[in-house]
């Protein structure tokens, strides 16, 4: 670029506006007044340095050589094909592999010495490189020598082992040959003469290497020089010349080759036939045989005797399970039972005696299995609980009739509002809570009061220490009140009566005391031993007196429990949570339940993953009389099941599986009996009884049990409620398919169907109904069942006429002159002719006249003439009934 370059020309060269170039020059510290001024080379370099510094680059003069980059990034892409198994087919997928490597050049100060000349530096580098190459070559040579020595030692070791194996094999063959020779000599001593010349060692080696006696008894052989009449051939064996038949020869050959597979035996037989016999086999074939024998490959061995199995059978067992234990097909087992005169299917159960008989018939042995092995071990675990009993909190169950204020009373004690959250304002689950009061800790169980929850109330009374019977002062004693008294009396639990709702104007506590006298519940003021407390859950009056009464009763009972050791208790309620899995609400009765314990709960087991109390906190452990929620079980246990903590998971699993097997056997026996009862019932009732299939899913186990019992109780002679499946949790796809197959109505109690289940239900038109109150479930099922019953035809008498005289007509025959004594007689309705209150004819009117005029009806106390169609035997004194048929909807 010349020295006469102006700012305008420089702007054109660098493709930059003149104003921007002037700003950049000013930023570099050079002042120019206009675009026509000349820019020198020094000023250009100064501007370039400024721009480099501005953009993060070093200030390097234009004339210097550009430095090599200090960091280089290399990208590489490779395409590969990967074969992926997709079921039975294989799919090839293209995979692109991307690699990125970055190389950083270290500063020159690390490997350059500035004081040395460039030529000396290059020589030193070359010498260093040569030295490193020589060291690498020496290392590689030493490694190759070491590997060669290792290979040589390995080959020598293999050769030594091979020689030892050959020597051992040779010794074994010599021993076998000597033993077989002695056996043959002993067996054939009566019919075979030994040759005077002993067999040579070479002859012995030429014999087959493996000779084994046949399983069956060896037939006697006779000596002969020529082929005998049975087609035998001459064989030389162990120094004896014997004549062996073709059958014996094949059997002996098979006995010598039983250790081989079928393919090897066929190949060896073809080699033997092609070369004229086993004594002329080549050395190569013998070597192959040695290699096959030494490889350890074991072929099928034909059993020499029948296999007798000894199995353990409990009190009952299904036909399929017994066949599996005896390694038989289920069809063969059923066939054997049919031959014994027992008509069963593979799913039916048979008792122990029948299992013994059929097993002995098939050649096997049966012993009685102890069905309580693991239960005994579990009992030993529970009996090992030692410790000093200490006082424990009382467990109090609140019972009473529905809507008498049980949950409201508990809400006031706990300072909560549970009753507001209950559907319909009624309790439908067992609620378990523990409350810290000034008088100590008290555990409360709130039970439902509806009639359908009888089993739930009985379960609450079973595990409680004190029953608080809540009776509304304005309502008095009701059916569930009496039932609660019976539950408490059956469980032997003391009773405290809480007369609630005394704040109402219609309250009459004295009436409650008098009505309970009929149930043998006598108040203390009447000379009895039952405490009566009048209270109001709305105002709180009398609640403290109730807590005092509970504390006094607990002191009298002297409740104690061992708080250390393995925990035992009872399942109060259980459910299936979508996010947490099976959840069981348990009440600890002995010991301490901790996180991480293994426990058996009915037919389920598991490890405690977490503990939750009623407010959602996670305690580390639960002491006696404290209810907690347990997570980690293998399934949803039944409410009322006992739980026990064990040492290891193996015992827990064994006990749970044994209990499940017992329950399964019991269920099969029960179902078989029910099937027979159903068949007999159908035979007796004919086909008039309708069947309503139901599939019930509920949120908790207790509600599910109550629903099933309440709905099955609706069955009668006209309709049968058949519950095909019950379960805890949401309605799934399998539930929907079951409902489609059995044409059942699906009932969801506080649960909903998932997306896949809803799709199946909509496509197939399944009747799905959601409920949250048990009253509504029972009412809706009654309506559906009534719809299945159809209508009933009833006959209603609308009029009665008395025959006063009989006239003869050429057109109608006998015409009865009648007086209507009751109701109305209509021409369009059917009639009956009664004589001495006995029906003698049933038909219809042919003519109804009054004063020779046809009329449609004749009312009470009016005379008329009646012509009966196709009946001429009407007599004076007969009665003619006129009736109509009406349809009436049938209900449960």
Swiss-Prot record:
Keyword Transmembrane belongs to the record: no
Annotated residues for binding of GTP: 400-407, 446-450, 500-503
Compartments where located: Cytoplasm
Ranges annotated as spanning the membrane: none
Chain segments carrying region Disordered: 138-250, 262-298
Residue ranges constituting the tr-type G domain according to the UniProt record: 391-560
Signal peptide region: none
Keywords, comma-separated and alphabetical: Cytoplasm, GTP-binding, Initiation factor, Nucleotide-binding, Protein biosynthesis
GO molecular function: GTP binding; GTPase activity; guanosine tetraphosphate binding; translation initiation factor activity
Keyword NAD: no
Function, in words: One of the essential components for the initiation of protein synthesis. Protects formylmethionyl-tRNA from spontaneous hydrolysis and promotes its binding to the 30S ribosomal subunits. Also involved in the hydrolysis of GTP during the formation of the 70S ribosomal complex.
Stated family: Belongs to the TRAFAC class translation factor GTPase superfamily. Classic translation factor GTPase family. IF-2 subfamily.
The name this protein goes by in its record: Translation initiation factor IF-2
Organism: Xylella fastidiosa (strain Temecula1 / ATCC 700964)
Gene: infB
């Amino acid at each position: 670029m010349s020295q006469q370059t102006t700012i305008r020309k420089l702007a054109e060269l660098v493709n930059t506006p003149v104003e921007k170039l002037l700003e950049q020059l000013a930023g570099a510290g050079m002042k120019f007044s206009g675009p026509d001024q000349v820019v020198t080379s020094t000023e250009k370099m100064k501007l370039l340095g400024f721009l480099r510094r501005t953009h993060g680059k070093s200030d390097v003069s234009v004339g210097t050589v550009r430095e090599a980059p200090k960091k280089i990034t290399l990208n590489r892409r490779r395409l590969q094909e990967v074969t992926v198994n997709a079921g039975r087919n294989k799919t090839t997928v293209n995979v692109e592999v991307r690699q990125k490597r970055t190389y950083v050049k270290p500063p020159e100060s690390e490997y350059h010495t500035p004081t040395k000349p460039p030529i000396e530096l290059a020589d030193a580098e070359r010498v260093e490189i040569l030295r490193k190459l020589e060291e690498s070559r020496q290392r590689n040579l030493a490694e190759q020598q070491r590997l060669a020595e290792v290979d040589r030692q390995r080959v020598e070791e293999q050769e030594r082992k091979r020689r030892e194996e050959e020597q051992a094999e040779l010794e074994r063959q010599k021993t076998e040959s000597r033993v077989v020779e002695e056996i043959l000599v002993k067996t054939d001593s009566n019919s075979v003469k030994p040759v005077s010349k002993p067999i040579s060692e070479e002859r012995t080696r030429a014999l087959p290497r493996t000779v084994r006696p046949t399983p069956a008894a060896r037939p006697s052989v006779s000596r002969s020089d020529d082929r005998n009449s049975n087609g035998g051939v001459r064989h030389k064996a162990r120094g004896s010349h014997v004549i062996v038949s073709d059958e014996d020869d094949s059997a002996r050959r098979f006995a010598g080759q039983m250790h081989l597979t079928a393919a090897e035996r066929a190949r060896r037989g073809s080699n033997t036939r092609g070369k004229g016999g086993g004594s002329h086999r080549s050395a190569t074939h013998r070597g192959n045989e040695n290699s096959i024998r030494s490889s350890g490959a074991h072929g099928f061995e034909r059993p020499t005797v029948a296999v007798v199995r000894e199995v353990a059978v409990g009190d009952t067992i299904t036909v399929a399970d017994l066949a599996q234990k005896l390694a038989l097909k289920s069809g063969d087992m059923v066939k054997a039972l049919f031959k014994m005169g027992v008509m069963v299917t593979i799913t039916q159960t048979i008792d122990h005696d029948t299992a013994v008989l059929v097993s002995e018939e098939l050649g096997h042995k049966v012993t009685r299995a102890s069905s309580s092995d693991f239960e005994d071990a579990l009992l030993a675990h529970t009996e090992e609980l030692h410790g000093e009993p200490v006082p424990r909190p009382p467990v109090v169950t609140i019972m009473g009739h529905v809507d008498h204020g049980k949950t409201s009373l508990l809400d006031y004690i706990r300072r909560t509002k549970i009753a507001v959250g209950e559907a319909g304002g009624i309790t439908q689950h067992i609620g378990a809570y523990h409350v810290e009061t000034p008088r100590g800790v008290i555990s409360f169980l709130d039970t439902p009061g509806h009639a359908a929850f009888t089993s739930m109330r009985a379960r609450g009374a079973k595990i409680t220490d004190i029953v608080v019977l809540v009776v509304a002062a304005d309502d008095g004693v009701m059916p569930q009140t009496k039932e609660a008294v019976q539950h408490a009396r059956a469980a032997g639990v003391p009773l405290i009566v809480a007369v609630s709702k005394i704040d109402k104007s219609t309250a009459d506590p004295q009436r409650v005391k008098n009505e309970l006298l009929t149930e043998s519940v006598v108040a203390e003021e009447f000379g009895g031993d039952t405490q009566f407390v009048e209270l109001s859950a709305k105002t709180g009056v009398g609640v403290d007196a109730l807590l005092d009464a509970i504390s006094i009763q607990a002191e009298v009972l002297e409740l104690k429990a061992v708080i250390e050791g393995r925990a035992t208790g009872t399942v109060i309620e259980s459910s299936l949570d979508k996010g947490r899995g099976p959840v069981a609400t348990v009440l600890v009765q002995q010991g301490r339940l901790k996180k991480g314990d293994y426990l058996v709960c009915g037919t389920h087991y598991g490890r405690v993953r977490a503990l939750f109390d009623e407010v959602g906190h996670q305690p580390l452990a639960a002491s006696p009389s404290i209810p907690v929620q347990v997570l980690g079980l293998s399934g949803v246990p039944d409410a009322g099941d006992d739980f026990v903590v064990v040492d290891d998971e193996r015992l827990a699993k064994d006990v749970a599986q044994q209990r499940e097997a017992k329950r399964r056997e019991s269920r099969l026996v029960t179902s078989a009996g029910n099937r027979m009862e159903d068949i007999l019932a159908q035979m007796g009732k004919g086909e008039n009884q309708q069947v309503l299939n139901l599939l019930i899913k509920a949120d908790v186990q207790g509600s599910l049990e109550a629903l099933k019992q309440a709905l099955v109780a609706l069955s009668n002679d006209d309709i049968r409620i058949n519950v095909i499946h019950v379960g805890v949790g949401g309605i799934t796809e399998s539930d929907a398919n079951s409902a489609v197959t059995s044409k059942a109505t699906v009932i969801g109690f506080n649960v909903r169907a998932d997306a896949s289940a809803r799709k199946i239900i909509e496509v197939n038109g399944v009747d799905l109904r959601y409920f949250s109150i048990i009253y509504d479930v029972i009412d809706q099922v009654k309506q559906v069942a009534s719809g299945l019953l159809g209508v009933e035809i009833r006959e209603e008498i609308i009029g009665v006429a008395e025959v006063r005289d009989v006239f003869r007509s050429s057109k109608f025959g006998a015409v009865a002159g009648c007086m209507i004594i009751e109701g109305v007689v209509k021409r369009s309705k059917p009639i009956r002719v009664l004589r001495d209150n006995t029906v003698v004819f049933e038909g219809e009117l042919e003519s109804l006249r009054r004063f020779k005029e046809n009329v449609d009806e004749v009312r009470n106390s009016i005379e008329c003439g009646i012509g009966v169609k196709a009946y001429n035997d009407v007599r004076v004194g007969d009665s003619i009934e006129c009736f109509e048929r009406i349809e009436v909807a049938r209900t449960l």
